[in-house]
Each structure stands twice: as structure tokens, then as C-alpha cells.
């Protein structure tokens, strides 16, 4: 009888895995390079999308661009019988630095695909609406921003088109953020809005430049991309900082776990791509729209191309010494944009289908031969068990794993706590795993 139960249990796991794999591959197949190209061209055609540019014209400036984005989200919602909640999230900022030279409304365009089971748990994909040229305060010159960041914005719209055809347990937010080039103002506004409204955020996938394959060094690479993540939350408490000094976890904050999740799912479902876990908040001394979320303790990463071309980035359109400058559409590789949009779409789907991670996870095993764990048992009937991941302390990613049943404590025999780092995930009946949960406390 017991053997029969074991066989049935593993048959269910295999069946669930097959359904999950089918969903992921179907999503990949539906991402359209042609639609991405058309949307990038449309955004470029607005001439400039500078945060301080025209908001009245129907054909030029950031006002026309954000109205078009909102219209696209509304059309997607119409096609899925109203499955998206589309609105402007408005923020008023007074001039306060060298890049915000006048008072301005910085308006984000938000589309929420509400989850069927956890409507207040959100996984977010963002792109930036605004663009700039060499002078960050020049809001009149043509600033096509084809790669920076029409690619990320078009990818967000395309992900919404595809994922709106499916239902997920958690909510997905697709958002165009404004004011990035002037100082990350749109992200600051939405992160504050999320905190005010008590959003339970799984994480934000910030897409900022996902279309360039030829670097300033001449190298061409259309098979890799970077995932930037900070090591630990910026708002951690003094106690958390104190504990980490003695118990480890210097590279195991919530953003780093999100980055590992994206890395591992990409390697599994898109093996021709080579994701690179970059252990930095962002590029050296620079910033992106995931940072305002990180500042409030939310998990967030930046997904972007491996090779940047600084002749195209933040440049007036011109030719000097036979070198072409400017972020024009000729510099965008649309097949590559499709690949990175697919990376986003499948990770949104996987995380939107995932159960909550184990709560109050504690670790023990000091001066003992085996490491042990305890956590709060999730009593929801679709949780079929948990899975322990571990790695050597010098390794960037999880190396080993062990599936366990519906329990709230477990001892990993003959694995010494000193030599490894650990996390645990929840697994639901459909085979979806939660984000990795790193222990937050200890016990004897």
C-alpha cells in the first residue's frame, strides 16, 4: 500500500512538471518579434519622450507616448475581456536637482492582471517611457531612445499581450515608468504607492536596455544578458546586520534570490541563452528603476543586455570623425529583444504561479553533525511539500537540492552547517516552486 502511494505521488509530480513545461514553452512561442519591432518604432516616432517634453501634442513628446501605452494596455484588456486594470499612477515633483529643472507631473502607466488566489501578491515587469540626449535637460531635441528604453517598454507591452491569455494565482503588474533619466522618479512614485497600499511584492523585473548586441568594444553577443542584484536589502535592521556577521548571508538578500530564480529558470527553459549573475545593484556608479523598490526593502533586479554601446547611449544624433552617435532604431537587434522579453515572460508566469515561500524559516546545527530547519507549516491544500537547496559558501548559485514532504521541520543528515548556505522553497500541486527563502533566524 505504501509503495503504491509513493508511485502515485511521483506520477503526480511528473504530470505537474509536464503541464508546467508546456505552459512555459507555449509562452515562449507566442512572443512576437514583429510586434516588438512595431512597438519600438512607434515609441521612436514620438520624436522625444523626455520627462519634461510636450504633454499636449498627439504625435510628439512624453504625453503622446504614455497615452499610446495606456491605449495599448486597454486594447490588450479588451481582448481578454477586461482582465487588466489600467490606470495612470501620478506623481507630482517640484524642481529639486540639476536634472529636474521645473515642477512636473511624472505619470506611470500601470496595468494589473489580477491573480485568482493571491490578488495582493504581485510580480512586476517594468520598462521606462522616457528618453534623453547628451544634455539631460534638453527636452526639445529629437531623442528616439530606441534601445534606451523603447526596448524595455515594448517588451513589457508584449509580455502583457501574451500573459493576458492565461490565468495565474498571483497578480502581475506591467508598468511603464517615467522620470528615470531625471533621477528614478517614476520608480520612486510607484514604490511609495505600493508601500502605501500594502502590496505584497514578490519582486520587480526592471528592463532597461534589452536590444543592443554590439558593444563599444566591437564585440557582438546575442546569446548572453546580465541580471544585476544587490546583496542584501538596503533597509535591513541593525539586528539583521549583526546576525549576518556571525551566521552568514552576505550575498543572500531577497533581490539576490530573485536573480538566482531568473538565472535558473532561463538555463532550464532557454538553454541557448547565457544569463550572467552580476553581483552589483547596477552598473558601476549608475542606477535603474529597480533601485527605488530596493530602497524600501522589495526584491528587485535589472535585466539588460551584456554589451552596451556608449556611442548610442545618451547621445545627440550626429556624426563625428566618421562615428555615428545616437540611440536610433538601426542599433536595435529585434531577435535579441524577443529573447529577453521571453526571459521576462516565463519568469513572470513561473512566479505568478508560485505559492508563498516558507514563513519564519529558522536554521540550526551549531556544533552538530547535521543542519536542521523549522518553519511555519503552510496549511493550504495545494502545497504538496518543500524543497531544500544548498551550496558551498564560495558558490554563486544553488548546487544541491532535496525534496521533502509536508512538514515544518527537517534535518539534513550529515551536512554540516558551517560549509554551506541554504534556502527552502514551497512547492504546489502544479509543480511551481516559490522564490528561494533564506533562513531569517536561528535555533538550538
Residue ranges, per PLM feature:
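Beta-strand-rich modules
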Residues: 412-434
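N-terminal capping segment at the start of a domain
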Residues: 18-61, 311-312, 317-327
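Conserved aromatic anchor
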Residues: 369-382
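Active-site-adjacent mobile loop/cap segments within catalytic or ligand-binding domains
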Residues: 44, 210-231, 277-353
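Short beta-strand segments within Ig-like beta-sandwich modules, predominantly Fibronectin type-III
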Residues: 400-407
Amino acid at each position: 500500500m505504501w509503495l503504491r502511494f509513493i508511485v502515485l505521488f511521483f506520477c503526480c509530480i511528473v504530470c505537474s512538471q509536464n503541464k508546467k513545461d508546456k505552459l512555459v514553452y507555449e509562452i515562449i512561442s507566442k512572443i512576437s518579434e514583429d510586434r516588438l519591432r512595431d512597438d519600438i518604432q512607434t515609441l521612436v516616432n514620438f520624436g522625444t519622450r523626455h520627462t519634461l517634453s510636450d504633454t499636449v501634442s498627439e504625435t510628439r513628446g512624453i504625453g503622446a507616448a504614455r497615452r499610446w501605452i495606456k491605449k495599448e494596455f486597454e486594447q490588450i484588456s479588451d481582448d481578454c475581456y477586461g482582465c487588466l486594470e489600467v490606470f495612470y499612477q501620478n506623481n507630482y515633483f517640484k524642481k529639486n536637482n540639476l536634472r529636474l529643472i521645473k515642477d512636473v507631473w511624472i505619470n506611470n502607466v500601470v496595468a494589473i492582471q489580477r491573480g485568482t488566489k493571491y490578488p495582493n501578491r504581485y510580480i512586476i515587469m517594468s520598462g521606462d517611457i522616457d528618453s534623453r540626449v547628451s544634455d539631460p535637460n534638453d527636452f526639445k531635441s529629437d531623442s528616439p531612445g530606441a534601445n534606451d528604453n523603447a526596448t524595455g517598454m515594448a517588451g513589457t507591452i508584449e509580455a502583457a499581450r501574451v500573459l493576458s491569455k492565461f490565468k495565474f494565482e498571483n497578480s502581475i503588474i506591467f508598468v511603464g515608468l517615467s522620470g528615470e533619466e531625471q533621477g528614478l522618479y517614476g520608480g520612486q512614485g510607484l514604490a511609495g504607492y505600493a508601500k502605501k497600499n500594502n502590496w505584497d511584492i514578490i519582486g520587480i523585473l526592471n528592463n532597461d536596455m534589452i536590444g543592443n548586441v554590439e558593444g563599444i568594444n566591437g564585440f557582438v553577443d546575442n546569446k548572453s544578458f546580465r541580471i544585476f542584484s544587490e546583496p542584501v536589502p538596503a533597509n535591513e535592521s541593525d539586528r539583521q546586520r549583526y546576525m549576518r556577521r556571525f551566521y552568514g548571508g552576505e550575498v543572500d538578500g531577497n533581490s539576490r534570490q530573485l536573480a538566482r530564480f531568473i538565472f535558473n529558470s532561463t538555463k532550464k527553459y532557454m538553454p541557448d541563452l547565457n544569463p550572467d549573475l552580476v553581483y552589483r545593484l547596477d552598473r558601476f556608479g549608475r542606477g535603474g528603476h529597480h533601485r527605488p523598490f530596493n530602497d524600501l526593502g522589495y526584491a528587485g533586479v535589472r535585466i539588460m543586455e551584456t554589451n552596451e554601446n556608449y556611442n548610442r547611449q545618451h547621445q545627440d544624433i550626429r556624426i563625428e570623425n566618421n562615428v555615428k552617435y545616437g540611440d536610433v532604431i538601426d542599433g536595435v537587434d529585434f531577435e535579441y529583444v524577443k529573447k529577453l522579453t521571453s526571459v521576462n515572460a516565463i519568469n513572470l508566469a513561473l512566479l505568478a504561479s508560485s505559492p508563498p515561500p516558507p514563513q519564519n524559516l529558522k536554521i540550526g546545527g551549531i556544533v552538530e553533525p547535521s543542519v536542521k530547519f523549522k518553519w511555519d507549516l503552510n496549511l493550504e491544500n495545494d502545497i504538496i511539500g518543500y524543497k531544500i537547496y544548498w551550496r558551498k559558501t564560495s558558490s554563486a548559485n544553488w548546487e544541491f537540492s532535496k525534496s521533502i514532504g509536508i512538514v515544518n521541520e527537517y534535518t539534513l543528515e550529515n551536512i554540516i552547517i558551517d560549509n554551506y548556505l541554504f534556502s527552502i522553497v514551497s512547492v504546489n500541486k502544479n509543480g511551481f516552486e516559490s522564490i528561494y527563502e533564506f533562513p531569517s533566524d536561528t535555533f538550538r
